[in-house]
């Protein structure tokens, strides 16, 4: 199987774009190396949409069905968070090897679930997610969307020495940071001989 990875013009403006673009960039990299990740994202989106549809026509007879969907949503959500966490861990290790060429960088995720997963077992994070989904039902009905979700996170990059957010750097400096992330990703691919990926720009 040969996967493809596209580097589009707006990639060079990643840290000037919105969080959805940065999250999509991260998810695209992970999907290139983990065939299950894209399926998990798809399943997560499917259950998220299904939950909103049911909540919009809510009645007490649907409570058990909503609980079942929320359980699925929380389960896939934690799997996605964990995959992102593990991938960033590898990227950060590779970024350290480029510190003599590029700025010393640390990549992080801003999401509440992402941060919780760094210090708590996955089962506890899943339970926390379930509680948030239950607490937010009325709010989600009113707004017609899932207000607490793994798709609310943002990819952050910091200069390790100054702890300056990449979004504060100049356009030229941001492009250097983006290239260093891509080189780190390529290094990750080189360490896995089972992966066949074609890059397009």
What are these regions (language model features)?
Residues 26, 33-84:
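Long, non-coiled-coil amphipathic alpha-helical linker/lever segments
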Residues 14-15, 40, 122, 146:
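Alpha-helix initiation/capping motif
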Residues 60-200:
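Conserved NTPase motor "head" modules and their coupling/switch loops across ABC/AAA+ ATPases, GTPases
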Residues 2-7, 14-15, 25-30, 44, ...:
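Long, contiguous hydrophobic alpha-helical segments, chiefly transmembrane helices and signal peptides
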Residues 4, 11-12, 34, 52, ...:
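Generic secondary-structure boundary/loop-capping signal
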Residues 1-21, 25-37, 92-96, 125, ...:
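Nucleotide-state sensing region of NTPase/ATPase domains
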